[in-house]
UniProtKB/Swiss-Prot annotation:
Record's compositionally biased regions (Polar residues): 150-170
Keywords: Cell adhesion, DNA-binding, Nucleus, Transcription, Transcription regulation, Virulence
Taxonomic source organism: Candida albicans (strain SC5314 / ATCC MYA-2876) (Yeast)
Bias type Low complexity, positions: 17-35, 182-198, 224-239, 249-262
Designated name of the protein: Transcription factor of morphogenesis MCM1
Gene Ontology BP terms: cell adhesion; DNA damage response; filamentous growth; filamentous growth of a population of unicellular organisms; positive regulation of pseudohyphal growth by positive regulation of transcription from RNA polymerase II promoter; positive regulation of transcription by RNA polymerase II; regulation of pseudohyphal growth
Induction field: Expression is high in white-phase cells and low in opaque-phase cells.
SMART domains reported for this sequence: MADS (SM00432)
Pfam families attached to this UniProt entry: SRF-TF
Localization of this protein: Nucleus
SUPFAM superfamilies: SRF-like
Record text on subunit structure and interactions: Interacts with AHR1.
All residue ranges annotated as the MADS-box domain in the record: 58-118
Length: 262
């Protein structure tokens, strides 16, 4: 009986020790959990897409930043992100004392704003509303650039549609002047041919009707030493001592600064 009682006492002592050990372990676990909660950093990210509040930071997955094709998921993401950015704007204005103006427009055209008091007239007055509406109604810049580039490429591929070069009035005037000069030259050549035909030998029994200079008188404008001398290219007529008197009334347009003597 004594052995049995000792055994019971020992077993009871062991049970007491086990209870105390369990209590110590529970207290240690609670302390470690409290320390972990104190040392763990506070998550300030409001990105809740694809995650739940019960999941830890390690279980979060990174989403690819691209346009969401599914309409329902796109609307859900818009609602969550809009609420998060509005919250961030409010916290920024309160924590730092800065003025914040946040403008968010949904896919359906609804406008959401967050403004601090000093910037609130920008979205409440008619001028600000009209400016926002004008910006929303403006065409897309990227689309306009693509259309312009496409139109430029079309004009480059179709040379038949290119405008004709503008005529320069100076060039036209110069061409007309050159044509006029050419006509004058032709007239001068015709006059010279007629003069050569009139230079045929005449009979020596009389003087021409246009003769005005007496024989022996020199031609004014010709040096005295050259008067009465034969010049090459001018035929001398029989019965005339002064070759210049015969050609006195014949006007040659090819000779510059010529004068006609009578």
């Amino acid at each position: 009986m004594a052995i049995k009682e000792e055994t019971n006492e020992f077993s009871q002592g062991n049970e007491g020790n086990s209870h105390s050990t369990n209590n110590n372990n529970n207290s240690n676990n609670s302390n470690s959990n409290n320390n972990a909660d104190v040392s763990a950093p506070v998550d300030d990210d409001d990105d809740d897409d694809g995650t739940s509040q019960g999941k830890t930071q390690k279980e979060r997955r990174k989403i690819e930043i691209k346009f969401i094709q599914e309409k329902s998921r796109r609307h859900i993401t818009f609602s969550k992100r809009k609420a998060g950015i509005m919250k961030k704007a409010y916290e920024l204005s309160v924590l730092t004392g800065t003025q914040v103006l946040l403008l968010v427009v949904s896919e359906t055209g609804l406008v959401y704003t967050f403004t601090t008091p000093k910037l609130q007239p920008l979205v409440t007055k008619s001028e600000g509303k009209n400016l926002i509406q004008a910006c929303l109604n403006a065409p897309e810049e990227g689309l306009g650039d693509d259309q312009e580039n496409q139109s430029d490429g079309n004009t480059g591929d179709s040379p038949d549609q290119s405008p004709a070069p503008a005529t320069n009035p100076n060039v036209m005037g110069a061409a007309g002047h050159a044509h006029h000069i050419q006509q004058q030259q032709q007239q001068q050549q015709q006059a010279q041919q007629q003069a050569q035909q009139q230079m045929a030998p005449m009979p020596s029994h009389g003087l021409p009707t246009h003769y005005s200079n007496p024989q022996g008188a020199g031609n004014p404008g010709v040096p005295p030493q050259q008067q009465g001398q034969h010049q090459p290219g001018i035929p001398l007529q029989g019965g005339y001592s002064d070759q210049y008197s015969y050609f006195g009334n014949i006007q040659n347009n090819n000779i510059p600064n010529q004068q006609q003597y009578q």
